[in-house]
Amino acid sequence: MAKILGIDLGTTNSCMAVMEGGEAVVIPNAEGARTTPSVVGFSKKGEKLVGQVAKRQAISNPENTVYSIKRHMGDANYTVTLQGTQYKPQEISAMILQKLKTDAEAYLGETIKQAVITVPAYFNDAQRQATKDAGAIAGLDVLRIINEPTSASLAYGLDKGDIEQKILVYDLGGGTFDVSILELGGGVFEVKSTSGDTRLGGDDFDQRIVNYLLAEFRKIEGIDLSKDKAVLQRLTDAAEKAKIELSGVASTNINLPFLTVGADGEPKHLDIDLTRAQFQKMTEDLLEKTLVSMRQALSDAKLTPNDLDKVILVGGATRMPAVVELVENFTGKKPYKNINPDEAVAIGAAIQAGVLGGEVKDVLLLDVTPLTLGIETLGGIATPLIPRNTTIPTKKSQVFSTAADNQPSVEIHVLQGERGVASENKTLGRFTLDGIPPAPRGIPQIEVTFDIDANGILHVGAKDLGTGKEQSISIQKPGGLSDDEIDRMVKDAELHAEEDKKRKEDVETRNNAEALINAAEKTLKEAGDAATEDQKSKVTAAIDDLKKALEGKDSEDIKSKTEALQEAVYPISTAMYQKAQQQAQQAQQAEGEAGSHDAQGPDETVVDADYEVVDDEKRK
């Protein structure tokens, strides 16, 4: 049976896992790492780079490198420009997913066509749809979109059997924050509530350090570096490193030599000490935001901290001591640590993939919609149809009427959010139901139906109960893509994949040619009298031809000249091998003759020595 990949598509890092032998196993990437930086770049030669290689070149090429694209998923107006080409967030995310898919296929030795992808619990409909679109562009059939905290609970609770317990999952990732309350027992994972902030994560903690370093450098040197992209990239990398170090030590030194050049032409260096206390002080308001979400989630679940049985920390940012202390103080419980915060979400996604594929039995996942869904009604009021924290999939209907006499149509304005005024909520889409027969206001019966699938994606319909006429839409805008757009992007992605493959082959062809030139030149030096002058001149000419071919870009010409050089070198290499073989045989014969001479017996001139045995007792 074909494998279904479980993917944690993270803001700063991504991870993938698969079910093997009844267990979820994390798949390392091509570089051997268990997580992959969610970074995409294009080299100055136009080569697409994803993961660690993209992150490594970001300092020298910041304008063609993209970080944290997940924060812009679902934003229809956001694009990034790389090497003069504009890309939507879905396309950048698809490049990351393609990298994971390709590496997984190489590891497993089979083609991957299906996946379960996780998203923050607080992602809205547009963000979820954008994630699904990214999977499609990458060539993946996304079977399910599941919430990250819920996925982590699967990783934690799969082996807990029939033990009933209430758990809080605190998920602070690179760019998003979620907290979910779940009830586990008998193989059922039921989400009771969720809360969070899709614009809060480890990146924000890094940015506070960057702001501090910019301010200190301005104070010391009088230079503002806030507009220098290359410098900002170096500061961001240093900030992330400092944040990680401060999780284990009380103080760290941030040293960046040759950061910039002053007006006098002298290089300027940055050398600043940062203590854990300073870091915690500059980020305490960020932690306070997570506390607000924890209170909200518990309130919605109608629970108190004392009702919790376990607290699970997920996401790399939860390694910060201040986070652990905050959660422990609020809940009164030490966080459960027998789970890798970087890998738990991907493992849970693989388990859900196993459920969908029939490999994992007796597990039922009951998730919720994070935000209230409704429509705009008379006076600009937001009227809810499905309250937040409703278990999904679900379907709700409500009957509305016209606001004016003889109104021929109604516009259905679909909203997501908690505000009472329509304009303060997120618009998911609009559509019109036409053909309503003339009637006084309040008489026509318009039934509006909201249907949320297991992915948390909304479908809306409106029906005139009097005429039976109906209209429906699957919410995709803003931020979603049409089928035509997805098809175009899939083709673009496939084209890029072919281009990348060809570019890689071209590089390998050049590398092989250069290696052969070095080997051939070495062979000429060592050949001596093993080769004729005619043979040597042929090799020299072939080397010159290949060097000339390398000055151009015609790979086929390089391959042809490489083969010609191999043919020219072969006779010399063969002659040298034969000569070395003859010399070795002669040496063995010489050793054999010397050995037989030694075995003839002692020389007659050698005199054997007389000896006498002395009795020690007599000596005494």
Curated annotation (Swiss-Prot):
Residue ranges with Low complexity bias: 578-590
Region (Disordered), start-end ranges: 577-620
Keyword field: ATP-binding, Chaperone, Nucleotide-binding
InterPro entries named among the record's database cross-references: ATPase_NBD (IPR043129), Chaperone_DnaK (IPR012725), Heat_shock_70_CS (IPR018181), HSP70_C_sf (IPR029048), HSP70_peptide-bd_sf (IPR029047), Hsp_70_fam (IPR013126)
GO molecular function: ATP binding; ATP-dependent protein folding chaperone; unfolded protein binding
Superkingdom of the source species: Archaea
Pfam family, one: HSP70
Listed Acidic residues bias regions: 605-620
Family designation: Belongs to the heat shock protein 70 family.
HAMAP family in alphabetical order: DnaK (MF_00332)
PANTHER family: HEAT SHOCK PROTEIN 70KDA (PTHR19375)
Described function: Acts as a chaperone.
Name of the protein this chain belongs to: Chaperone protein DnaK
